[in-house]
A protein has these predicted regions:
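Short beta-edge strand/loop motif at the mouth of beta-sheet-based domains
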Residues: 54-91
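Hydrophobic pocket/interface hotspot
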Residues: 46-50, 81, 96, 107, ...
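Beta-strand/loop substructures that line and gate deep hydrophobic ligand-binding cavities in soluble
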Residues: 112-162
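Hydrophobic ligand-binding cavity/cleft-lining segments
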Residues: 18-68
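Short, highly charged C-terminal tails/helix-capping segments
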Residues: 170-179
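Bacterial N-terminal signal peptides
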Residues: 7-17
């Protein structure tokens, strides 16, 4: 029994070293979410799968169409992180501001419900080589207006992004986004 408890503690500690989600700050008009994760693959591979295979790892529950395979990221300045909808509709989630493959990807815009709030945000992915692969740092800084204050949205945004980045990690390492 004691060895099972020790094993459970070790698993939790190891998982904590892999995913470090944090609401870095929040206030009435905005928040910043930061996630740091180790991924066992080269930065170029992580970047490529993030950009070119977004529909394979993004959670379909966080799409307007209900199908993540309708998502795409155009790898160019002013490129679109877009989603196709039925009946020739579309959603422009974010715009590519800056990319250096295997090093950084920065998008501008508002995800999901933040679009209707007139919010503006920057979502930055930084890829740093480390001995066992890549340290991926994700920062989402958002400003906007909500009657209850934007701080109340920080934890849900953190949860959604942590889910997405965990799915990316799983996809890169195993070929499957969900474990």
């Amino acid at each position: 029994m004691r060895s099972k408890a020790l094993l459970a503690v070790l698993v939790c500690l190891c998982a904590w070293n892999v995913v470090l989600p944090e609401v870095a700050d929040s206030g009435a008009n905005g928040f910043t979410v930061k996630i740091t994760m180790s991924i066992h693959a080269a930065p170029a591979d992580v970047y490529r799968k993030l950009v070119h295979n977004v529909g394979d790892w993004w959670n379909s529950q966080h799409t307007f169409s209900g199908d993540a395979h309708n998502l795409s990221i155009e790898e160019r300045p002013m490129g679109c992180f877009c989603e196709k909808l039925p009946n020739s509709g579309a959603v422009r989630h974010m715009e590519v501001l800056y990319f250096d493959p295997g090093k950084i990807l920065r998008l501008s815009g508002a995800l999901g419900p933040f679009q209707g709030m007139g919010a503006a945000g920057a979502l930055t992915f930084t890829f740093t080589p480390q001995d066992d692969g890549t340290k991926l740092e994700v920062t989402y800084a958002l400003v906007g207006y909500s009657p209850q204050g934007m701080a109340s949205w920080a934890a849900p945004a953190n949860g959604m992004l942590t889910d997405q980045i965990t799915r990316l990690k799983n996809y890169v390492e195993t070929g499957k986004p969900a474990m």
